[in-house]
């Protein structure tokens, strides 16, 4: 790991914004995606229903993933879709979450507000662009129910929390040697407890302030030049905004003159009722044995991922384990250099609530 990598990670930790999360390379994110995988199994057309009406467009199943045509989102659901010919990029959605899809004749790369995770995988099939149903559920405010027997997916608008989410920019002076582009979400709502609203906003703003403090600490060392100016910035995405729960992904970026930039990703999950920052134990309270299952399963997955390479062995979840919540379930986040090589990217593992909770059990018990 380079000197600048260590500086960035140390500065972030010193700023107190990452509860155990260190900086990781940005290459996985800047590629804006997971590589297009070869389509090995494609099922016949799938019926799509929107608010009870059958749409003319058809979905497809690829390797077990239900894929929805982007054209149907525009033409039938009324979701804004635009195209930038210069960058060959589609923008899907409006508001605080937008999908960006970079498409070529055979590949398609997708991110949400500049953030890519391993659950994102767009497809180009017979000249049409498709995105997985899970992206609609997790980031575009659309509920989706899959009926395997009828080969039908039913879409409807999600019942989101009655809050407003507005991006804010942290004032910072850029110059020829450094660029700061630091933003963070702030929430408001007439039904929110004012103290809870303030507590949540304070945590998110403090995260942004920590990025700026870390950048200024590095800049004070005087190594930046006009030929290779430094950069400090971030992106955020709203991963869950339902049931009185808000989960936010914050992703920070730095470039300090090395061969490549660096990123760090952190999840924050809040109860809107009181502003409490939730731990994994709060989300999965209905299953007192969740750690036993996750520790065993993660060890198996990480051991397979390492394939004998010399990285640290996974032992157990951290007391303040980094995670975020989506409609798809809970995503456990680790740092790149802990368990995997640079080329792998940020190791993340998503588990559905059905996997983590007993039958009939619900997440967020006592928090909503």
Residue ranges and their predicted role:
Residues 2-5, 27-368:
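Compositionally biased intrinsically disordered regions enriched in Thr/Gly
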Residues 6-11:
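Sec-dependent signal peptide recognition
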Residues 13-18:
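Hydrophobic helical h-region of N-terminal Sec-dependent signal peptides
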Residues 19-28:
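C-terminal segment of classical bacterial N-terminal signal peptides
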């Amino acid at each position: 790991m380079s000197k600048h990598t260590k500086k960035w990670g140390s500065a972030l930790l010193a700023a107190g914004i990452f509860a155990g999360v260190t900086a990781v390379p940005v290459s996985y994110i800047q590629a804006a995606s997971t590589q297009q995988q070869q389509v090995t199994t494609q099922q016949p057309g799938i019926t799509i229903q929107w608010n009870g009406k059958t749409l003319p467009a058809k979905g497809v199943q690829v390797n077990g993933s239900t894929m929805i045509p982007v054209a149907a989102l525009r033409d039938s659901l009324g979701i804004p879709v635009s195209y930038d010919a210069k960058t060959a990029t589609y923008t899907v959605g409006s508001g605080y979450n937008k999908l960006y899809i970079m498409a070529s004749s055979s590949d398609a790369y997708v991110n949400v507000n500049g953030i890519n995770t391993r659950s994102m995988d767009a497809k180009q099939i017979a000249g049409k662009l498709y995105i997985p149903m899970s992206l609609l559920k997790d980031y575009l405010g659309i509920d989706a129910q899959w009926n395997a027997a009828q080969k039908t997916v039913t879409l409807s608008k999600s019942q989101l929390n009655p809050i407003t989410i507005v991006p804010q920019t942290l004032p910072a002076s850029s110059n020829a040697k450094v660029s700061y582009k630091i933003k963070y979400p702030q929430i408001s709502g007439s039904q929110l407890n004012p103290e809870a609203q303030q507590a949540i906003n304070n945590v998110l703003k403090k995260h942004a302030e920590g990025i700026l403090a870390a950048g200024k600490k590095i800049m004070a060392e005087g190594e930046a030049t006009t030929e290779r100016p430094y950069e400090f910035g971030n992106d955020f995405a709203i991963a869950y905004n339902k049931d009185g729960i808000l989960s936010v992904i914050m992703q920070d970026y730095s470039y300090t003159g090395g061969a490549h930039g660096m990123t760090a990703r952190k999840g924050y999950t809040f109860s809107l009722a009181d502003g409490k920052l939730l731990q994994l134990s709060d989300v999965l309270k209905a299953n007192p044995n969740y750690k036993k299952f996750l520790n065993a399963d993660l060890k198996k997955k990480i051991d397979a991922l390492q394939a004998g390479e010399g990285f640290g062995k996974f032992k157990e979840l951290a007391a303040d384990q980094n995670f975020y919540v989506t409609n798809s379930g809970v995503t456990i986040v680790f740092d790149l250099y802990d368990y995997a090589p640079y080329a792998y990217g940020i190791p993340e593992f998503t588990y559905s609530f059905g996997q983590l909770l007993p039958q009939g059990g619900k997440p967020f018990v006592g928090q909503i």
